[in-house]
Amino acid sequence: MNQQGLEDIEMARQMTTNGCYNKAFDLYIMAFEKNVAIKSAYESEFRMVMTQLNEVLMTANKMEDVFINYTRALMTYPNSIIILNDMGKFLFKCGFYEKAWEHFEEALNLDYTFVNAEKNFNSLKNLLVERWHFRMLNDKVRNEAYRAAIHETVIPRVDTILDLGTGTGLLTVYASECSPRITTACDGSKVMSDLATAITQENGCEHCIIVNKLSTEMQLHEAGGKRTLLLTEVFDAGLFGEHVLQSLIHAWENMLTDNARVIPSKAEFFIIGAKCDFLHKRYQLCSPIKEILNVQNMNVHVLTFDETYDCEDVHFYGDDIKYMTEAKSLVCVDFNNCQELKNLIEMDHCEVEMVVQETGEINTVIGFFNLYLTDNVTITTDPRSDRRANAWQQAIFYDKIPVQVVENDIVPMYFSLNGGKLTMYKDDTIIRISPETIRFLNDIEYVNAIAACIGTTCIYLGQMAEMSQITVVDLSPFPVFGLHLLMRGAKSLTCCAKTDSDKEFFEIVFECNNVPLSNITILIGDEWTQEGFKDEKYHAIFCNIFEVCGEIDLRLKAMAEHLKQHHLIQEGLFLPASIKLMGQIVKSNWLDINNKLYDENVSNYKISKHLNPYQVTQNFCIDFSHLEYTPLSDVCVFGTSDSTEGVEVIDVPIIKDGLANAVLCWYIIELVQDLREVTTNRKNCFIDGIVFITDPKIRVYRGQSTPVLRSVDSDGAFKLTMHLEE
């Protein structure tokens, strides 16, 4: 080997040891300039030094220097997918989205099996264009209703239009069919404004102005003067959550003529009491686990994070939901009456009396709305209606404490419009904990599976030491395993709480079960590190490596591996014993329309070519138990959580002809070797499923096999890709 440059490498290593990362970085670059042949041999350690240097610089807020370092690194290693990905992440973090896009795309063009680059690219696309844009634009019921209302209302060559929150500009395109004098469309998102500009131009919309601003930030001259007709669709599941009241009040006061009209002209929000154990378990601690934890009298609900309701596709739930009351109108508003809008936004109390239709229990409250676009055109999101628009989900008011009811009972419910957002009054004193902890504890099947392992665990540990000497780590969202061992006399427990609220709840549970807090160490949040365990050794370690969304948490995975290797007493017990990665090839129209636009659904206007570049290859938080899909393959094992880095092809047997567009993915957890397995593909599991999406669709045939690539990065991140040989 040419020795030139090697002295610089040695000096760079010395500088790194001394913490002089800047000088070390320069010395590596100097060495590579002297001797190009040595670059590949030293790329890994060079990247490590650059990472350390950039961390120091970012801490000092020297972002320009970080950018320069990445630029120099890419000049040296122009085809390094890792450096391209790292620079993309940096640009993403700094808000340079177009440049980040270029770097992720280039990394994937060099190696399409690179998992981290694809995940980062998906995250960027999700940020720039949220998935609901796809489902909304694919909703022909909504689209044709708005189109009909616009045609009914617009006076050709007379009306001037303001399209408030235009998104992709579809309503502006529909309005152009009616020859208005001029249309101004506004949106606060630069990406959506750029898309609207391209789409309106592509589809021949004349006399159209696109403004990249929220309507409430626009000046009158930017709108081109006062308008005679306002179009809007800025509604969420709770109707008012996207600040539509504030936006319309501002528009009436600043942007509209006195005799202007609004589409929709009116809106009405309804609530309905229901029994849905599936939803109840998502948001409140349920009776079975409260009995296990000995906290029967506590009302424990999910942390709200300043949200007053959640949203779900309730129409999928079928027999899992029973509507216990009639639907009752909570709010009806005329968008053409500015004073009514002002009165509504200040409403601090609204009471409705719900009439019970059958004896049973109410444990959740569902909200939906009607949009009266005109006197003749109405859209509903009523989950019971076959004519509903699926662009919007239904609102879930999750703080309703379960109540037993009898047919014809009157159940009062109280709401306010808190800052323009509907809020349901709480029934009673509520303690709040993280969604992760609620979901984990309400997964009774998993909690019972853990409990079923305790006897075997104690026998095994008893062969190592007296129970009073047993030390335990349990890094689950709630330490069910650790609590059982403490109640059997274990010496100590180290566990982790997602939030301070979780920590307080843990302490209450420990005290209710007569477990001394002096025996417990609770780590809080996500900032604790491996170093916090020092040189301690433990007899039993239980780790959770999953995020609620269904993804593997790489930080927790690395923590679990570290604890197993360095902090487990010899012959100690590590749980779970194994985790298998499972999958199945499917056809799902629902997954398709949430990720790909079809022009046939937008009246054959040319929109898909502009929106579909924002398609992603992976979706999270998928509830398989209520997902519409057709299985096309057998269920297959695609690997384990310990699968080695690289790419492996798995041949998947096909059981049904069809066009495949996704691989569903879940896990089988073996808690103790050869003793107990639990699948995560079931209703009420503590984690959701994930899907890997294929576009274009792949035709598969019964009796044949379809190859699926399992790609694993060095950190354990993985993806599945359906693959057909060219």
Predicted feature residues:
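Phosphate-/polyanion-interacting regions in eukaryotic proteins
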Residues: 79-80, 99-102
